[in-house]
Amino acid sequence: MNLHSLYIAAIAAGAGAAFAPLTMNGADTVAEARGFSSDVILSTDAYRWQGDTIFQNEFKAWAVSPEEIRSTYKGRPGYFMPVEQTWKRKNDLSSYPRLTSNNKLHEAIYNMGLDEMVNAVEPDTTLRTGKEWAGVWTRDVSYSIILSMCYMQPEASMISLMKKVNPSGQIIQDTGSGGAWPISTDRMIWVVAAYEIYKATGDRQWLEKVYPIALRSIRKDMATVMSPRGLIKGETSFIDWREQSYPKWMQTVDISQSEAMGTNVLYAAALNACAQMADILGQRKEAARLKADAGALTDAINKYFWLDDKGYYGMYTYGRDHKIMNPRAETLGLALSILYDIAPAERQKSISTNNPHTPYGPAIFYPQISDMPSYHNNALWPFVASYWTLAQAKAGNEAGTMEGIGSVFRPAALFATNKENFNLDNGDYYTELNSSNMLWSLAGNIAITTRVLFGIHFEKDGLLISPFVPKALEGTRTLDNFNYRGATLNITVNGYGANVAKITVNGKEYAPGKTIPAKRLKGVCDIVVDMDCKPIPAMDVNRRPNLKAPVTPQTWLTNNPALNGEGVPVNNYLEWNPIEYISKYQVLKNGLLVAETRETSWPATEPGEWQVIGIDARGVPSFASEPRSNRPATIYQFKNEGTGMKSPELCNAPADGVKGYTGQGFVEIDRTTDPETINIKIPQSGMYTFALRYANGNGPVNTENKAAIRTLMLNGSKRGTFVMPQRGVGNWDDWGMSNRIQVPLTAGTYTVGITYRPENENMNINTNHALLDQLVVEKAK
């Protein structure tokens, strides 16, 4: 195609103002034309990337130059933030790696990432979370560091991570659901980020500083949040808006007892990272222990989360005494399972081809919750899409990698900034909460260039350069002025493919696929990578329209006199509300399927936990309903009950006393009170559950860090941990149940102790306070 017809084709494709007339002055022609190709690079049902322009419906965005993006996108009227329709470089980027490619839009999006990265560096050299979000957040900054800040902003990354260490020398779990840790437990991503900084910088003093913090935090978690199955309990990493990803009936205490795939995967990665730290520092025995723990957790993840019928890991377990799997696909956790080799090689391929991919990109999870607005639910987050793109490249999925790149580049171009999240139905930024200049979004933008197309991978003692270049992006691209452990790297990648044919450093050839020792990279290093330019073996992409799951049934237990009989529980009849579009209901007892019916009731003539799942005509299941138990329970009151509150740890004291307790009152507990003890009798051997009826008005349901934590002791032996999340500011009349601790017991008498131990220290440190009303004991089986 000649240059004239190239321009005409661009106009015909609707590029209009995105394309300027071409000049025809000899040797400059190719350079002038490289940003004006009408070739379609990527097309989905939602948008098209053509040349230097993104098209979506009537809107388009294009690169005027590598330092300017313009967009015609119009936002929703009345939304609290306007659409940025232009980005122009405002910061000096000369000290950062410089990209040159055969696509101007790619260069501009990368440069916008750098420009907004400079905006994110605060005067105290910490990394700001986003334009609308000041300060440092553990998970946000850690995920950003792993993607690209460890090598783009190593000093700010170090300072930011150290801001997230508390006075006890442990990693901070930021304020969150029910009072932070141990409801949310993804703070260990800090460990992975800290080790990534070491790999990028080789700074041994940094390693000596962070290793004790990592080890101390891991040991505390192992004593508190490990489930009987050897999995880590707690909220799904980063997806921390409760009803945005969990059934509405689940309280924060229920979330604290769930086992989330993504959180477990990052924890296994953290254990491996800490083991590597220990090994480098000569702590061989500790390294071996950590490696063994990582291996055991990896085995548990593969045993309990893998869904053969889906070809990927389920999202989380949920319920009360009998957990079931939420079979949704959760993209970040799946991506991490590939990137950190938690999934074996064959499962990595399966995940790559089976995780659903919508026209706008990979969902946070799939399918969506039908009666929830867009934020984590029904959303695309570019930082998650970036991790998924890295994982697709590692798995060798060319089409998946291209669609991943597009899912990040489309919104970056159309909105002329790195926003946090987008509605998965229409690709718009109208969600429950959003921000421009988001740290993890821009970090992911940069990582697509550096980690995928240039294939930069940091090892503990060197650099592995292994690009993955889809055929649609073939050509020559350079990344100059890349700093690595004091050396300046100028990297050129030629061609396309999944494999390197030849790699040279200052003219000296190195074996493709092998780590280049750090000691060989000194001064200025010109690295040239020639790809093999062979077709990448085709792999499937599980392209799916965005899908909404049916609403959750509401259930209740009643007495049906016709079902009464010896051994039959009083509440012997399970009922639920009819849902119009449900084709059948599944009835579960103790987490197992016992019946399918089109009716809205079922005889519950055996004691147990009962739930219902609705299945719509497409075969899509709802969440399981809240477990309803008709097992008999024994209730114990505490000794020395009262009605007053006097602890110095008390926050938000009630104005007119406490109401809603049973018996003569309640007992008040804090870090200094003596253990509460109750003598109980177990009449029959079996599995028993222990729970506390409690109140905690020290903070709101959705934030702060004052969850109360206590240890269950039976005859002097530790048997589990009680978690008592915040239930609302000053809500001392709102009594709820703690988690249930299952213990196998033989018949006999026991002394129950509820005590505060060092591992019960919460994130607030100073306030670990609650009111206790009852101890509830049930025979589970």
Q: For the regions a protein language model found, what residue spans apply to each?
A:
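Extracytoplasmic
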Residues: 607, 625-781
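Non-catalytic C-terminal accessory modules of carbohydrate-active enzymes
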Residues: 387, 391-561
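Beta-strand-rich modules
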Residues: 602-622
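Extended glycan-interaction surfaces of carbohydrate-active proteins
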Residues: 56-58, 64, 95-135, 156-181, ...
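Pro/Thr/Ser/Gly-rich low-complexity, intrinsically disordered linker/stalk tracts
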Residues: 546-580, 619-634
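Aromatic-rich carbohydrate-recognition surfaces in CAZymes
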Residues: 55, 135-141, 145-236, 260-268, ...
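Short beta-strand elements bearing conserved aromatic residues within extracellular beta-rich modules
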Residues: 501, 584-587, 710-712
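Inter-helical turn/loop segments and adjacent helix faces that build the functional surface
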Residues: 197-209, 274-289
